[in-house]
Amino acid sequence: MIRKTLAASCAVLLMAGCNAARQQASPLPPVAPPQTYVEPEQAAANPGSMFNDAEADLMFSDSRARRVGDIVLVKIVENAKAKNKADTTSERDSTNNYTVGAYFGQDSASINPMNPVGAFGGKVGTNALLQTGSKSKLDGKGETKRENTVTATIAARVVRVMPGGLLQVEGARETRVNDETQYIVLSGLVRSRDVASDNSVMSTQLADSRIAYYGKGVLADKQRPGWFSRLMDNLWPF
């Protein structure tokens, strides 16, 4: 009875190991704002002036992002395709025959132990004394292919203004639906003149860009094999 109980317990553990670990539903902390954000210095108020810096932009400039703290809309359109293919074929075939045309003036000999020429066992020059041959062939093929497509829109914040009109932007978005959370994180450099009149910029115009799109939840867990399957893949030598 004890053996049957132990066997049943081991079977249950093995079956449980093939399933992905369940994730407990717990509130996730919101995406933290960029750490490099620096609050711009406020100009001293001038009560005697009709206009101030905060309202001057509405009259003398457009609404495109150009200062620290401004918001710019980044349109993520990433299409990446890569393919590599290699074929190798190598073949070599060689045959070598070595014969003696004459031996001490004789062109033939009979099999006679007392006659050293007879050791050749026949006519001199007709039978090969040494024959070698070799043949080798190699066929190799390899192919890799990868394709990625990401399309999204995210609002990013200007965290730094660099010389030459470069804007360092960072942004993040968190979306949760039925305990499934999706994250989009973006950072990069963009020229202020590349920002369109509607305060948007394409992700292909970002330099040193980093775009991450990942998720956490039930669907993400189902994408991975169980812990026992991963353990066996690491330990199995074949």
Swiss-Prot record:
GO terms for cellular component: bacterial-type flagellum basal body, distal rod, L ring; cell outer membrane. Assembles around the rod to form the L-ring and probably protects the motor/basal body from shearing forces during rotation. It is a lipid-anchor. GO terms for biological process: bacterial-type flagellum-dependent cell motility. Residues 1-17 form the signal peptide. Pfam families: FlgH. A lipid is attached at residue 18 (N-palmitoyl cysteine). This is Flagellar L-ring protein. GO terms for molecular function: cytoskeletal motor activity. Keywords: Bacterial flagellum, Cell outer membrane, Lipoprotein, Membrane, Palmitate, Signal. A lipid is attached at residue 18 (S-diacylglycerol cysteine). The keyword Protease does not apply. The gene is flgH. InterPro entries: Flag_Lring. The basal body constitutes a major portion of the flagellar organelle and consists of four rings (L,P,S, and M) mounted on a central rod.
